[in-house]
C-alpha cells in the first residue's frame, strides 16, 4: 500500500530558558506532551540546543497536530472567552514561567514525505543528537527546495546513517524551511560537518543555492521525552 502524504500540522517552539531551568522545563514539557489524552498536540520532542552551535540556554519543542482543524480546536480552548483557558493548562503555563522567559514559535507544514510522529516511532530511529537546519529561501521556492531535499539529499544523508525526522515549510510566510535529522552519535555529527567541506557537500550546497539564500544549522540534544532518544518509552511521564 502506498504511503499517504503527511497531513499533520506542527508547532515548533524556541524557548528562552531562565538560568539553569532547562532540565526542569523539559521534564515539565515531557510530562504534558507524552501519552496525552486531553485532546492537545502530542510531543515529538523537547531538545536542549547545544550552546556551542547557537543561543543558550535554549530549548526547542516540536508538537504534532492532526491538521488545521485540530489547531483551530486548540486555539478555541486556549483563547476563547466562553471557555477561558482550561484549568489544567493554565496551571501548566503558570508553573512553566519559573523556567522560561519567552520564546519564538512557528507553525510548520510538512512536505509530503516528512514522517509523522507515529512513523518515527515505528522505524525505531534513535540518536544522541538532532541536526536542525532553518533555511531562508527565495520567495515561493520552499516547496522546490523541499523536493530536492526529499530526493538527492535525503538519500545522501541516509548513506551516512543520518535519518530524516522532519521536513517543513513555515506557514504564514513563504521564505523559510525547517529540517530535522537524527544523528546516531556525536561522532557522526562531526563527520557530517567534515564532509560538508568535501566535494559532495559543496556540490549539494551549490545546487541548494538555486533556492536557499541563507541557512543556520544547530545541534539539538534530545531529552528522554524525544521520540528518537535512546531511552524513550511511549508511556513515559
Q: Residues of each region from the PLM?
A:
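The conserved glycine-aromatic submotif of the RRM
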Residues: 52-60, 171-178
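An amphipathic, aromatic/His-enriched active-site/gating alpha helix that lines ligand/cofactor pockets
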Residues: 1-5, 23-46, 51-56, 64-107, ...
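Surface-exposed interaction/gating patches
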Residues: 9-24, 110-188, 226-229, 234-237
Amino acid at each position: 500500500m502506498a504511503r499517504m502524504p503527511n497531513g499533520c500540522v506542527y508547532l515548533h517552539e524556541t524557548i528562552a530558558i531562565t538560568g539553569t531551568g532547562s532540565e526542569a522545563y523539559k521534564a515539565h514539557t515531557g510530562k504534558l506532551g507524552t501519552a496525552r489524552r486531553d485532546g492537545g498536540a502530542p510531543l515529538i520532542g523537547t531538545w536542549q540546543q547545544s550552546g556551542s552551535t547557537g543561543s543558550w540556554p535554549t530549548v526547542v519543542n516540536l508538537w504534532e497536530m492532526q491538521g488545521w482543524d485540530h489547531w483551530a480546536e486548540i486555539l478555541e480552548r486556549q483563547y476563547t472567552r466562553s471557555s477561558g483557558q482550561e484549568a489544567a493548562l493554565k496551571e501548566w503555563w503558570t508553573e512553566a514561567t519559573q523556567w522560561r522567559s519567552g520564546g519564538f514559535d512557528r507553525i510548520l507544514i510538512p512536505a509530503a514525505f516528512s514522517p509523522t510522529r507515529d512513523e518515527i516511532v515505528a522505524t525505531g530511529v534513535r540518536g544522541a543528537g538532532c541536526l536542525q537546519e532553518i533555511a531562508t529561501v527565495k520567495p515561493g521556492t520552499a516547496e522546490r527546495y523541499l523536493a530536492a531535499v526529499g530526493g538527492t539529499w535525503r538519500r545522501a544523508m541516509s548513506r551516512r546513517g543520518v535519518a530524516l525526522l522532519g521536513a517543513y515549510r513555515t506557514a504564514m510566510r513563504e521564505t523559510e524551511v525547517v529540517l530535522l535529522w537524527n544523528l546516531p552519535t556525536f561522532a557522526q555529527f562531526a563527520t557530517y560537518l567534515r564532509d560538508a567541506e568535501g566535494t559532495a557537500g559543496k556540490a549539494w550546497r551549490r545546487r541548494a543555492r538555486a533556492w536557499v539564500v541563507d541557512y543556520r544549522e544547530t545541534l539539538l540534544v534530545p531529552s528522554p521525552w524525544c521520540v528518537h532518544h535512546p531511552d524513550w518509552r511511549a508511556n513515559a511521564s
